[in-house]
């Protein structure tokens, strides 16, 4: 599990931005697959529970100064349920209403981040948010949105991330 700088779906492709210093980036280079678990608005507390963790045992100074800690199993810490991938080797998070399995097609590196193009190979959607077999009911889908260190949903602020105070003090 890792956070993304940006994600954009384009047809059957998802383009993401990711720090090259993250364990997630290392996993993408080695495994060539990714699962995007799209959380709903009820999920922010679980995300915040793992927010100060890193999957990489060697931490950059800025993470050490911010009291991050190494966690080899974020699923256990966040109390997430693993589901085996059906088309890829990566796992899905059962509690996330939408899960998208992808294969990495291209990685373009910059100074400290990478742009990764992923081909969508499977999509799983919780039945309760479907309008019909191929469309999501937008009135029932309340995605968790992480916007400038704040957890929100389509029209409501839910909570602030622990790092939000950094911006208020600047």
Residue ranges of each PLM-predicted region?
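Basic, polyanion-binding surface patches
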Residues: 1-170
């Amino acid at each position: 599990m890792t956070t993304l700088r940006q994600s954009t779906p384009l047809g059957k492709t998802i383009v993401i931005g990711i720090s090259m210093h993250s364990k997630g980036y290392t996993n993408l280079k080695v495994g060539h697959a990714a699962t995007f678990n799209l959380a709903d608005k009820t999920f922010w507390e679980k995300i915040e529970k793992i927010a100060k963790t890193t999957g990489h045992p060697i931490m950059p100074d800025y993470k050490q100064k911010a009291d991050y800690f190494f966690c080899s199993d974020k699923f256990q810490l966040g109390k997430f349920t693993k589901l085996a991938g059906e088309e890829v080797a990566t796992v899905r998070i059962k509690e996330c209403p939408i899960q998208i399995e992808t294969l990495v097609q291209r990685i373009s590196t910059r100074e400290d981040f990478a742009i990764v193009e992923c081909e969508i190979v499977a999509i799983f959607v919780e039945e309760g948010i479907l309008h019909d077999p191929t469309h999501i009911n937008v009135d029932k889908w309340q995605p968790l949105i992480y916007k400038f260190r704040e957890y929100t949903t389509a029209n409501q602020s839910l909570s602030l991330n622990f790092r939000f105070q950094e911006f208020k003090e600047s």
